[in-house]
Regions:
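Substrate-gating cap/lid alpha-helix
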Residues: 241-274
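Active-site segments of SGNH/GDSL-like serine hydrolases
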Residues: 222-249
Length: 319
């Protein structure tokens, strides 16, 4: 048996296979919507790819950040049509906690950004950083640098990436991955598949009194932005009022939560908008307990634009 010849042939096939797989990963990342996998969340990876491509093309004065409360409940076009923002980019992704919002912003060039809008709900302040697999590699990618290590790691994850990408990309559900030009995913009510469980869901909330430690990641985010001369705007999104009133303990917590944020905003000098109280939406604006349809997203964003215009006017008056 010609072992040397066999090993040489085997080695050649192995090198050829790895090279072909490597080129496939590179090609998919460059020429399709399939993202490189930097995180445990394929939806986050899709947003990371989108964000890098957008940031390479132009600069933005306003970033939208957060979980699906920002991804689905903000209509960036409304902001751009107002006088408060010219170029808006939505960097949000499903399930991003406040800690992960700060982590991502630390990897992004903020030199042209004047305002960051954090659209949130009470459950976004809980949770630590856990989605990013290799923070150093992701930071290199966001700077436009070559990430050879990640390309090779993605060869092994290619079957899983294909499966997860096509599993999650379902129009008319909360899992839809196709962003508009700003990075939003606004839900069109017609044809939307309303999930009965999510319509009646009250996510877990703390049963102990709130203090600053509950908002430590928000405070760290605010400090990070203030150091760079960037305004932070925090929004509490609407929640189905019927659900709030159905649980006395939750109702008490929800109002305590919004009151605490209001007080905190005055001390820490960020803009706070309690959109739940100000809009007082009925069920016709919701697709589940706390996600809005496209009309609800437009109205919420118009409220934000109007409030920021008032803030800008009051500051001019103070000069």
């Amino acid at each position: 048996v010609d072992y040397a010849g066999w090993l040489k042939a085997w080695f050649g096939y192995a090198v050829g296979f790895v090279a072909a797989a490597f080129l496939l990963v590179v090609g998919l990342e460059h020429y399709t919507d399939m993202p490189l996998r930097f995180t445990k969340s394929v939806s986050y990876d899709v947003k990371i790819k989108f964000a890098r491509e957008q940031l390479e093309e132009k600069s933005f004065d306003t970033f939208i950040v957060g979980s699906s409360m920002a991804l689905n409940n903000i209509d960036s076009a409304v902001l751009e049509s107002s006088h408060v923002s010219q170029h808006v980019l939505n960097l949000s992704s499903w399930g991003l906690a406040a800690s992960e919002v700060l982590q991502f912003l630390q990897m992004v060039d903020l030199s042209d950004v004047r305002r960051v809008i954090y659209s949130s709900q009470y459950f976004d302040y809980q949770g630590e950083v856990d989605k990013v697999l290799d923070e150093r590699e992701l930071a290199r990618y966001m700077k436009g640098q070559w990430v050879l290590k990640t390309y090779f790691q993605n060869i092994a994850r290619l079957p899983e990436s294909f499966m997860r990408y096509f599993e999650e990309d379902h129009q008319g559900t909360q899992r839809y991955l196709k962003f508009d030009e700003h990075g939003d995913v606004n839900f069109v009510r017609e044809g939307f598949k309303i999930n009965k469980h999510k319509w009646e869901e009250i996510p877990p909330f703390p049963k102990t009194p709130l203090d600053d430690s509950y908002f430590k990641h928000l405070l760290a985010l605010n400090d990070y932005l203030k150091d760079r001369g960037i305004e932070l705007v925090v929004i509490t999104n609407p929640f189905r009022q019927e659900l709030i009133e159905s649980d006395e303990e939750f109702q008490s917590f929800f109002h305590t939560h919004t009151d605490y944020l209001k007080r905190l905003s005055k001390v820490q000098r960020f803009v706070y908008i309690n959109a739940h109280a100000e809009l007082n939406f009925d069920d016709t604006y919701f697709v589940d307990a706390y996600h809005l349809d496209e009309t609800g997203a437009q109205r919420l964003t118009q409220l934000v634009a109007d409030r920021l215009e008032l803030v800008r006017f009051s500051r001019v008056q103070d000069l």
